[in-house]
Regions:
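Bacterial N-terminal signal peptides
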Residues: 8-18
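Formylglycine-dependent sulfatase
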Residues: 2-7, 20-330
Length: 330
């Protein structure tokens, strides 16, 4: 076994990883669940009475529902390059889809690098797609598996779970035998009200329902393993979508994303409102997320990060605007 792994194992065994930050406050676990391609219009708690998302809706009732969260890019890889670095893709040169240009990795590290410095176990199951060359996408993660046993070993964890059931690819295929009724949809004004469109809406509602069930499964597992009371849960999608005029397009349909954050009672000082179940109007840009996660964890927040901390004791002034952008993409 490598020496570093032996040393880490001893630290875990004797409980010596820093569960408390420098100011004496307890470090939270963070579970970040992401889905793909669904904008707010596919989620019940955001106002669609036909959406079947009971687990996400329940999470919103237990947490804080952000009403104005926007992706910086309306497609996955550029969007995720901003997530992993905290730097705008237009600054990095990662905006063109599938380009994977190198960046100066010595100056621009990935946010899990900073989490691991303060004792976090960092895992991603499993979507990276960072569109960055010169470094393996998996290099910053301790694991690409969901291993509840390791998450219970005493060190704080940052666990990413990506649910792909709502990805654009799930919107294709047979649309004549859906469980969701084509009559029970909220049709966008820019789509014609014809049977084919209604069937495609119903088909994607089925995909979102499956995604919601997976979110519910992971939240149940978190509870069953006795980790809920120490874990901040974040749910959001990676950009908008998925029917025509959404994904890849710089409209709200391509960028306006659900964001729900459940914060345990022990961290109530970080609540953005008086009580869970509140709707939060603050404007949040995806570029704000990595900087905020580092702040919540009590980790170093590098100056190169361009976002605003929107939650916790390090919260910064609300951003006056958000910017989205796109370039070449498939």
């Amino acid at each position: 076994m490598p020496k570093l792994n032996c040393f880490a194992s001893l630290l875990i065994l004797f409980g010596l990883f820093p569960k408390f930050s420098a100011d004496g406050s307890e470090r939270p676990n963070i579970l970040w669940i992401t889905s793909e391609d669904n904008n707010v219009n596919w989620v019940g708690c955001y106002g669609n009475p036909h959406a079947q998302t009971p687990h996400i809706d329940k999470l919103a009732s237990e947490g804080f529902q952000y009403m104005n969260c926007f992706a910086n890019a309306p497609v996955c890889a550029p969007s995720r390059s901003g997530w992993i670095t905290g730097v705008h893709p237009v600054s990095l040169g990662t905006l063109p889809m599938r380009s994977r240009y190198d960046i100066p990795h010595q100056e621009i590290k990935y946010y899990p690098d900073y989490l691991k410095k303060v004792g976090y176990y960092c895992a991603n199951v499993r979507k990276t797609d960072y569109n960055i060359g010169g470094r393996s996408d998996d290099d910053c993660w301790d694991s690409t598996k969901l291993e509840w046993k390791k998450l219970k070993q005493g060190m704080p964890f940052f666990q990413v779970i990506n649910v792909a059931s709502s990805h654009e690819s799930r919107a294709f295929g047979e649309v004549d035998n859906t469980t969701h009724s084509p009559e029970d949809i909220q049709l966008a004004k820019y789509h014609p009200d014809i049977p084919t469109i209604r069937k495609n809406y119903a088909h994607y509602h089925d995909a979102v329902k499956r995604m919601d069930a997976e979110v519910g499964k992971f939240l149940k597992q978190l509870h069953q393993h006795g980790l809920s009371e120490n874990t901040i849960v974040v749910y959001n999608s990676d950009h908008g979508g998925v029917l025509p005029r959404s994904k890849r397009h710089l409209f709200n349909s391509g960028t306006h994303c659900p964001l729900i954050i459940r914060i345990p009672e022990k961290f109530r000082a970080w609540w953005p409102a008086e009580s869970p179940g509140s709707k939060i109007d603050r404007l949040v840009s995806f570029i704000d997320m990595p900087k905020t996660w580092l702040s919540l964890a009590g980790a170093e927040v590098p100056e190169v990060m361009q976002g605003k901390i929107f939650l916790g004791k390090g919260r910064e002034a609300e951003r006056p605007y958000h910017v989205s952008y796109r370039e070449r993409m498939d």
